[in-house]
UniProtKB/Swiss-Prot annotation:
Lineage: Bacteria, Bacillati, Bacillota, Bacilli, Bacillales
Pfam families assigned to the protein according to its UniProt record, in alphabetical order: Ribosomal_L14
Subunit structure: Part of the 50S ribosomal subunit. Forms a cluster with proteins L3 and L19. In the 70S ribosome, L14 and L19 interact and together make contacts with the 16S rRNA in bridges B5 and B8.
Keyword Ribonucleoprotein: yes
Name this protein carries in UniProt: Large ribosomal subunit protein uL14
Family: Belongs to the universal ribosomal protein uL14 family.
Alphabetized HAMAP family for the sequence: Ribosomal_uL14 (MF_01367)
GO molecular function: large ribosomal subunit rRNA binding; structural constituent of ribosome
Gene Ontology CC terms: cytosolic large ribosomal subunit
Keywords for this protein: Ribonucleoprotein, Ribosomal protein, RNA-binding, rRNA-binding
Top-level taxon in the UniProt lineage: Bacteria
GO biological process, one term: translation
Biological function: Binds to 23S rRNA. Forms part of two intersubunit bridges in the 70S ribosome.
Organism of this sequence: Geobacillus sp. (strain WCH70)
Entry keyword RNA-binding: yes
Length: 122
């Protein structure tokens, strides 16, 4: 479960490698984020020369979770790590490439640009 103080790997080439969740968006008392939810995070680790710098506050969408998600047909999908993609305010990704698989649930939440850039949609 992704909550405040959770650390996520960044699955794009925006320059950030790891972020720490500051807030889960979507309601005043919202505690947990799942796949497709937007969080506010700060960059804890970044690569030199990237678009995003260490210490910067960014918005990100969760694309993979260890907890997984239940689908309407009764199946579950879960991943080996918790990962996110850094986004702009218009839901478009800051980077130009996405690394690793992403869940199909992002399509329902209207993150079509991330779906199209991802190498695999599960």
């Amino acid at each position: 479960m992704i909550q405040q103080e959770s650390r996520l790997k960044v699955a794009d080439n925006s320059g950030a490698r790891e972020v720490l969740v500051i807030k889960v968006l979507g309601g005043s008392g919202r505690r947990y984020a799942n796949i497709g939810d937007v969080v506010v995070a700060t960059v804890k680790e970044a690569t030199p020369g990237g678009v995003v710098k260490k210490g910067q506050v960014v918005k990100a969408v969760v694309v993979r979770t260890k907890r997984g998600v239940r689908r309407s047909d009764g199946s579950y999908i879960r991943f080996d790590e918790n990962a996110c993609v850094i986004i702009r305010d218009d839901k478009s990704p800051r980077g130009t490439r996405i690394f690793g698989p992403v869940a199909r649930e992002l399509r329902d939440k209207d993150f079509m640009k991330i779906i199209s850039l991802a190498p695999e949609v599960i």
